[in-house]
């Protein structure tokens, strides 16, 4: 269901107009980006998501809704409703574990996603990195950051190994173990891109876990494991800069200390690697 109202409504207006029998239940923890609440009627629950990024155009939020509308129930919650500034999606009953599932299970989930039809819009990291630089706190801009940004822009993004739909925010808190298997939530960064970019961006604990995931995916996708790992490593500096820039971006937007701590730690990792 999609509404054509062009003016963003408040949460209470959304509830009274479209979900009059529902009431707020608890806040939804869906990754670091937030912007969600759970509404309930008797035992039925729905996740109500708000467009929480004031710097992102409304089209980005609409893409999120369209991605969920395209995806099968074996991968993601169903999209239920959209109006400018808000969407409602199915609440997935299950267990969320901050740790990633084992390599074989996660590789199977990502491979299943990447066998789906493409979304129809490409993920482009270079303009996103430039946006994070321009939108961050000016006091946080450093010569090191600018040098790394210019070097990546000069080199250009790696040529894709294989284009497919990507989730681009795969970590334990965005994976729900339901009675029917693993499902991914929080699809706001989804788009089409290189499968190796998705694997490079997974929030792994260490290189050993990363290699296990890459090898499991290569076996399932029938790709040479060494070739896939080389491609993942080509994307690695882009992904680290993406994470650092996003933390800076969210720090400027929210002032929340968790983001500045994460940004500082990511910059330290980059400096250690030269």
UniProtKB/Swiss-Prot annotation:
InterPro entries: Aminoglycoside_PTrfase, Kinase-like_dom_sf, Thiamine_kinase. It holds the Pfam family APH. Belongs to the thiamine kinase family. Catalyzes the ATP-dependent phosphorylation of thiamine to thiamine phosphate. Is involved in thiamine salvage. It comes from the Bacteria. GO terms for biological process: thiamine diphosphate biosynthetic process; thiamine metabolic process. SUPFAM superfamilies: Protein kinase-like (PK-like). The gene is thiK. It comes from Salmonella gallinarum (strain 287/91 / NCTC 13346). The lineage of its organism: Bacteria, Pseudomonadati, Pseudomonadota, Gammaproteobacteria, Enterobacterales. It catalyses: thiamine + ATP = thiamine phosphate + ADP + H(+). Pathway: Cofactor biosynthesis; thiamine diphosphate biosynthesis; thiamine phosphate from thiamine: step 1/1. Keywords: ATP-binding, Kinase, Nucleotide-binding, Transferase. This is Thiamine kinase. The keyword Kinase applies. Its EC number is 2.7.1.89. One of its GO terms (molecular function) is thiamine kinase activity. The keyword Coiled coil does not apply.
